[in-house]
């Protein structure tokens, strides 16, 4: 699929905009700014594009290189902005993503799988056909979903997901609520924000046909968007600096009335698309030279720096060719000594047969050391997936993978200071830390310029 050309400028006077950070949010903002006719310069400290959602090379059991991902990410059909951006930069979405109805079943087929029907019929039929659930379980979930819908998917701001689900049968919590909550918010139900959880349900399960579909990447995450977007940006005339860290951010004129200097280079505006910690560092650098807006900028930096985070780990493992899972994604039963929640058969997603990704979300489930984590996860997968020959290749741990989406978390706003903005999945918004949240944040800030 050929890359779409940049449309004509939406502004009569293009601006010079610096985007600091080449993850999904920064790339989304850069593409949108170029489409609007602005001159974009993009910096990325690492030697790869994509931030936490990027390609990674590991060695298989024979010592041969394999391209995987820094962490196994799931997209869903409701990720409309991400899908549109992929198409803009030339990604063949239909070939690059495997679309499946929502499937949270384990290796024995127990749990929920939705049919390919429009809502609410998909949920109603999926719940009615769920294996391993009693009719009491099914009625309880349908009744609770109807209650959430009557409440317009709103709840008390301080409520957790556990509060929303109080009284539901344990089987439903184990087979549906917990896997969905951990995969979407990366927190157990007792800690996760009820408000955000209901928003995710509304915008995926109840938004329209296909919104809850799983979209599993058949290629590495770098090719899926950020690396491909970098090539598109270069073709459109943007300036990209890979492997270069921004050290200095200074205002031009009193309180940046004339813009900013990024490492001595003048720009009309700056967009911080880094991690929250790095954005806080740059904001403090900027605040030191501000006057009337200094305290506001320092306050923003304090919020960004104080955000609590949770970890995600991925154990890549391989079993003899010919071994595999009944579906590309299978739920695992987690608990003490069994930390993983999902297994992905990468052999069904464009990778070599027998390659598995075992995902451990929610930091409470992570053992203290990586060796114990890998051993426990491997033993769990061998037993629950009936793969005794499974051997570990590499364990990847992102200690600050996502901000902790608790009911009372204070997320910083997108506006930092005059002509200085921030974007990322941690910035104030209705969604948890997801790829779509990052992309939408980048697009919204680009529009603000």
Labelled PLM ranges:
Residues 200-252, 256-260, 269:
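Helical element adjacent to the flavin cofactor pocket in flavoenzyme catalytic cores
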Residues 79-83, 87-198:
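Mobile amphipathic helical/loop "lid" adjacent to a hydrophobic cofactor/ligand pocket
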Residues 1-17, 35-36:
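Extreme N-terminal leader/targeting segments of oxidoreductases
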Residues 34-59:
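Glycine-rich FAD pyrophosphate-binding loop
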Residues 2, 36, 247-371, 380-384:
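Mid-domain catalytic core of redox enzymes
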Residues 73-80, 155-159, 208-232, 368-373:
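Short beta-strand to alpha-helix junction loop
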Residues 15-42:
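N-terminal Rossmann-like FAD-binding beta1-loop-alpha1 element of flavoenzymes
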Residues 2-8, 57, 115-118, 341-449:
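Conserved flavin/dinucleotide-binding core of flavoenzymes
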